[in-house]
Amino acid sequence: MSSRFFYGGGSDSDSSSSDEEELYSDREEEEKSEEEESSEEEDETSEEEESDEETGAKKFLKDVASDSEEEEEEEKVTVVKSAKDKRLDELENTIKLIENAKKINDWAVISTEFDKLNRQVAKITQSGPTPKIYIKTVADLEDFVNETVAKQKSGDKKLNASQAKGFNAAKQRIKKNNKDYANLINKYRKDKEDFMESDDEEATPVIAAPRITKLERIEAPAAAIDDDGFATVGRGGKTLQYTPESILKHLRVIVESRGKKNTDRMEQIRTMEKLLEVAQTPYQRIRVYLTLISTRFDLTSTSSANYMAVDQWKSAEQDFSSLLSVLENNRDHVVSEGAEEWEDDEKQPTIAPGETLYIPGSIVSFAERLDDELTRSLQHIDPHTAEYIERLSDEKLLYTDLVRAQAYVEGLNEAEKTDPRQDSVNRVVMRRLEHVYFKPSQVITILEDATWKALPSELDSSITPRASSGNVENLVLSLCNYLFKYSDGIIRARAMLCQIYFLALHDQYYRSRDLMLMSHLTENISNFDVSTQILFNRTLVQIGLCAFRSGLIYEAQNTLSEVCGSGRQKELLAQGIIMQRYSTVSPEQERLERQRQLPFHMHINLELLECIYLTSSMFLEVPLMAQTSSSPEMKRRVISKTFRRMLDYNERQVFTGPAENTRDGVIMSAKFLAAGDWKKAAEMLNSIKIWDLMPQPDKIKEMLSQQIQEEGLRTYLFTYAPFYDSLSIATLSNMFELSEKKISAIISRMISHEELAAALDQVNNAIVFRKGVELSRLQSQIVTLADKSMNLLEANEKTLEQRTQGMANAFQRDQGAGARGGRGSGRGGQARGGPRFPGGQQGRRPGGQQFGGGALGGAIKA
């Protein structure tokens, strides 16, 4: 059937306008070569005439040497090649390149040069027969392809990825091309030498086409175009026809123009949208959708913005959904990443009953790209506007596509289980898990219900069946267990972290903690990529928040200290970039850092995180400071340097006003608790409004009040234990409004941990303190003074050694030569045989003031 890809006025030829242009260019080249030959002849004749006209001294000055030069010039013959000979030379050069590539098995070069060879032969055959050297080359290439296939099947020689790609492309093209020269190839294979030596070449008839000017090509009568397809007259008079037969040719042109400059991608998108309207077969629609979605994604690389436009993203999502619908309705068409490309644009592949047609492409890559573009768009939108909420609603469409893509690749993997297909299933399951692990159960339930309602009723998933979509915990557990079983490396580690995060978010502290410990991720997390390390930090923080909600203050503070103690919460959680004044970060590193930032709806509230960390530190630090006030040996123990620094800064203030923010509220509460006023401490801590952001805020405030009562009791006992001989438990119960049973339990724990030197008298219901175990205030001050004196002595001796440059005879206190009472230069003495200085000065260094060792040196000299 004649192609309507191009239409030229005044010509009924079935060839495309591109072939006509090549024909015209060939004729123009011949004309130019003829003109060059004629101009060269004219130049030669003019030179001869000028030489004949030479008269006078010039003519008679020529000697024998000049005659010999003329003979040499006559021997030099200028060879002028015709256009046909030049093309044959180019053909031979191309064949040499193919032969060299065959020796090193470079199929990429063979494929490229084979296409070039065919273009050169097409020009030669327009004015003559097919060259025999071309027949020899294509026949030998086909034999070489068959040998390579046999070696691959036997396992003798395996090709790498790039070689296999070039080999598959070359094999299809050679097979298709050799069909047109089957008779000549058979003659060559029967007797190769006779075929190459014979001169009886059948000249192919050449039809002399009349010269067609550009004016005639521009005229394209619209009445001559059939109405079975669209027709558009483009620039230069080229008629673009959109018919089912020309779809593959259009797609070929679009694919070859990818990555080139000055390519109008919007025009290509409009072209493919028209091709969709005329597409008739599932194969045509699938090919158009695959190219159309890729072209929409290419728009991002040329735009000034770093993210995809909203309208183009929605169009790409609709095209992706339509592509999945076509694939679900036509199970004999499969989009696979390792499939071979169909090279014949003139006809479409035919599918026999029971066979499957594999089309090159990747469904999972499209789903991942849609996910990445949505995330990138959310990163660039102000989260405090309605636009962000509206854009976030598109996540439901994306999640539906992810579930649909998962069901599709599951079916392919079950039909034929291979490593690439298993990897595709793992990738799409991981993407789905990353969209649900940080959400509360209620939100996931709503999302799952809406997703399964939007999908066709006959569609189901074997990993997460439609019937079990109501149980959120089983959903996350099924996704994670599947990845634990079939994946490894980064995907497996990320699945583990997502499950731990989900359990911690839903107040299952002990399960999440045990999973984190058993995974051993804390030991080797530095070996993973940056995004996985960010997920690890988020999971660690969520475990700490879960421990705090459960009332486990020590576990919460210990877990959060690694992230919150550094002061770089924003960076570690990928929730912002801290721009330092003298940073050496390159623009490329900054760009990558911004790409890793999480969208706002995935953020953990940093103010709430800081409040919980400071509150946990307060409950541990205030009793510790009271305990170390009477125990100098415990002075250096610090649990939270951040909290201590803030508390010291607040105490240095001359005037302290009311608490203005969350941090001030926690510090004021700590000061009340240290002073023994636990009621004011509880009132101040509960007045912080950020607790309302947590689930069940009343329960949290009740837990905080109870914790303040217990830590207030411990602080009181640490502070006033040296002043009591015994203390009634009933008195403590009235003072801190705790039950006597609770107070007895707290005191018993303190005694067992050796924090309190006392005994519990259950008969009298009192605490009996042991004297002489702990130091008194006076004894503590004496020990402190002794420590400072020893530090001063060590500092002076170190300074003295530096000033005397390590001389061994400076202030020696041991017995030996030169020591006090020995022979030599002791105090007031002089070494025997040593040099004498005037005035009796022994060894005084000239210049400067002699170091005397300060107060300690004076004491030694005395």
Swiss-Prot record:
Positions with biased composition (Gly residues): 818-862
Stretches with biased composition (Basic and acidic residues): 55-65
Disulphide-bonded residues: none
Compositionally biased spans, kind Acidic residues: 17-54, 66-75
Single biological process term from Gene Ontology: formation of cytoplasmic translation initiation complex
Location relative to the cell: Cytoplasm
InterPro entries: EIF3C (IPR027516), EIF3C_N_dom (IPR008905), PCI_dom (IPR000717), WH-like_DNA-bd_sf (IPR036388), WH_DNA-bd_sf (IPR036390)
Chief place of localization: cytoplasm
Family annotation (Pfam families): eIF-3c_N, PCI
GO cellular component, one term: multi-eIF complex
Xref: Gene3D superfamilies: Winged helix-like DNA-binding domain superfamily/Winged helix DNA-binding domain (1.10.10.10)
One of the record's GO molecular function terms: translation initiation factor binding
Record domain PCI: where: 600-774
Keyword annotations: Cytoplasm, Initiation factor, Protein biosynthesis
Chain segments carrying region Disordered: 1-81, 813-862
Function: Component of the eukaryotic translation initiation factor 3 (eIF-3) complex, which is involved in protein synthesis of a specialized repertoire of mRNAs and, together with other initiation factors, stimulates binding of mRNA and methionyl-tRNAi to the 40S ribosome. The eIF-3 complex specifically targets and initiates translation of a subset of mRNAs involved in cell proliferation.
Family: Belongs to the eIF-3 subunit C family.
Record text on subunit structure and interactions: Component of the eukaryotic translation initiation factor 3 (eIF-3) complex.
Protein's name according to its UniProt entry: Eukaryotic translation initiation factor 3 subunit C
Organism expressing this protein natively: Neosartorya fischeri (strain ATCC 1020 / DSM 3700 / CBS 544.65 / FGSC A1164 / JCM 1740 / NRRL 181 / WB 181)
Classification lineage: Eukaryota, Fungi, Dikarya, Ascomycota, Pezizomycotina
Gene: nip1
